[in-house]
Structure formats: C-alpha cells, structure tokens
C-alpha cells in the first residue's frame, strides 16, 4: 500500500497550519512555544487518510532549515499564500526548495480571501502567482481560493490532493533500508523513538540497524505508522521507530538509519550547484557555507575551478564537510540561514 507525503510551503502567518487543521482536524502546532508564539517552529504531522501524511513546515526565515528537512521526502507540494499579503520572501524561497526536490505535483492555496474586500486585488495576486510558478514544478497547478470563515474551498483542496496522490509514482532506488531522522524523543516505558520518511528498502520489527555517522548499533523494538502499530514499513512510509540499545543522546535530526554496513560516511562530496536567477549573493572559492543534507544541517567549505558562482550560473564543486556525514540525497547550501541554493549530487548508497 503506497504511502504519500504532502508538504506545505509558504510565508509565516499565511495560514498553513490552519489549512492543515481544516483538512485533517489536527492542530500540528504541538510545542508549547509554538502555541504561545502563534507560529510553527518545527515540523508538524497530520493524516489526510490512512495513506497520506501532511507535513506542516515553519514559514519563518529563521526556521528554513526545518522546512528543508521536512521537504526532503515530499511527493506533493501545497504552496500556501495569504490573499491579503500576496507573494512574500518565504513564498519564493519555499517554492525554490519544492522545485529542487522535483515533487510530482501539487497546488497553490490562496487563503484568507474572506478578509480581502477587493476582488480585483485577489485576481491580481492570482495572476502574480501564475507568473511565479511558471517554469517550476508547480507550473500549471490549480490555484484554489479558501475562505477561512466559511470553509469554502477546503473540499476542492482535499479533492485535488486525493486525485494527485493517485498519480504519484514512488521510485524504488534501492532494496536496502535507509531513513533520515527528522525527530527524536524519549517516551516513558519505551525509550528512544525516532521518526522519518523511509527513503528506500523495507524494515521489520526485530531488524538490526546502524545509526550514521556515529556508527551506533540498534535493534527495532517497535514500529508505528499513521498512529498504529505495524510489523513493517517500506518506501514512502512515515514511520516512528522504537529503538533498543540506543541512548537519546546517540541519535539526532540528521542521523541516517540503514541496514548495517551498506552506507559509508564521508567528509568530502562532489556536487553540482545551481544558483537561482533571483538570488542576491555569490558563492566564492574556499567560502564557508551552510549545508542542508537530507535532514541534517552542517557547515562546509567550497572548492571549485572558478573564482565564484554568480546568480543564474551553475557549476561542479567539491565541498569539504566539517564533520563526517552519510550522504545519499539532495543537499542545500546557504551562506546564511535565509539564503538557499540547490546542489544536486549522486547517491552514495
């Protein structure tokens, strides 16, 4: 049974969490700090049905690393834009991240239309959105207006998501199990629990795992998906794994779980960097940059044949990592928390 992951995207306070709640009945802002501040800080999860998970990501620029972590395994993108604000900085940045991951479909949701009395303004925002998504992975995607007060448009959003989910084709890249950890917590009576989306292979209760890059051995004590206990999980599944023989301090976001002995760790990667045309910075030779690799965040230094890469340019580089890491995914580079370019690289597994 194929599992599909939908990821929200969009600027802070544009209604992503409220939209997810309207679709699923779940408030994904679970942290006390999130509820107090009225904003999403970390990843939140809700279920549209037994096969579809929605990941609610933070919209604030300070938490862009969490958005990148959440988007790492998304199949369908849902770009959320408030009608009163229109296109904002993180609208563009989140769209670039979705575009980089080559998601298989999606839509744009225009929220808060109930607080805008000017129909011409809403039409203008919609035209600007059509121009924004042109030549991206969301090119031609529907733009659905949602009234936050009456709920008008919610059923149309749900219908489109369900239809798109049926068209998703999950690529089987390897028969070996691999999963990037995006959350870790301890539960009384259970011990250490990690969550993530299965990248490849299958996992069963009782299987042995290796935690990288620290090379910690673990055994799967229990598995949950969509809130229920299961015996196994496969590609695309959102999974919570109860790990035996693992201390809470030995695993963290960015850890890669795999079958023992199949993935190496490295401190050097070869990548192809694409600088977006609207970025306002350059990457220079020997520059120290921030990388978002899978669900990990790490610093590294760029080595390349040319003095620099400017906006609109692309090129192959070698990136020296400051700590060893298991690399088998897309990575993101940024000289600051708010600026991202994409770097595509081959899998090492």
How would you describe each model-predicted region?
Residues 131-277:
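Conserved catalytic-core segments of large NTP-driven translation/proteostasis enzymes
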Residues 73-92, 104-107, 113-121:
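Conserved Switch II/interswitch segment of TRAFAC-class P-loop GTPases
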């Amino acid at each position: 049974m194929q599992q599909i992951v939908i990821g929200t995207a969009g600027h802070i306070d544009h209604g992503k969490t409220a939209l997810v709640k309207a679709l699923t009945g779940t408030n994904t802002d679970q942290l006390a700090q999130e509820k107090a501040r009225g904003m999403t800080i970390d990843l939140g999860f809700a279920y549209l049905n037994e096969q579809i998970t929605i990941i609610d990501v933070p919209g604030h620029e300070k938490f862009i690393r969490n958005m990148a972590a959440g988007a790492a395994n998304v199949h369908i993108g849902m770009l959320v834009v408030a009608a009163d604000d229109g296109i904002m900085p993180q609208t563009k940045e989140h769209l670039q991240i979705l575009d980089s991951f080559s998601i298989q479909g999606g839509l744009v949701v225009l929220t808060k239309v109930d607080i805008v009395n000017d129909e011409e303004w809403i039409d203008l925002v919609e035209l600007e959105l059509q121009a924004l998504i042109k030549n991206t992975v969301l090119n031609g995607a529907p733009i659905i207006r949602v009234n936050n007060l009456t709920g008008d448009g919610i059923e149309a959003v749900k219908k489109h998501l369900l239809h798109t989910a049926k068209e998703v084709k999950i690529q089987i890249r390897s028969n070996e199990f691999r999963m990037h950890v995006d959350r870790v917590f301890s539960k009384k009576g259970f011990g250490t629990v990690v969550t993530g989306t299965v990248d490849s292979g299958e996992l069963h209760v009782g299987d042995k795992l290796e935690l990288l890059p620290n090379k910690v051995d673990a055994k799967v004590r229990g598995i949950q998906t969509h809130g229920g206990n299961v015996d196994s999980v496969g590609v695309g599944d959102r999974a919570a794994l109860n790990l035996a023989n693992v201390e809470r301090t030995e695993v963290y976001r960015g850890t890669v779980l795999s079958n023992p002995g199949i993935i190496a760790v490295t401190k050097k990667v070869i990548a192809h960097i694409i600088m977006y045309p609207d970025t306002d910075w350059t990457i220079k030779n020997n520059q120290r940059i921030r990388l978002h690799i899978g669900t990990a965040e790490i610093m590294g230094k760029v080595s390349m044949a040319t003095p620099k890469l400017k906006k609109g340019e692309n090129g192959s580089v070698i990136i020296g990592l400051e700590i060893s890491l298991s690399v088998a995914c897309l990575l993101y580079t940024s000289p600051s928390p708010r600026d991202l370019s994409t770097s595509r690289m081959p899998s090492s597994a």
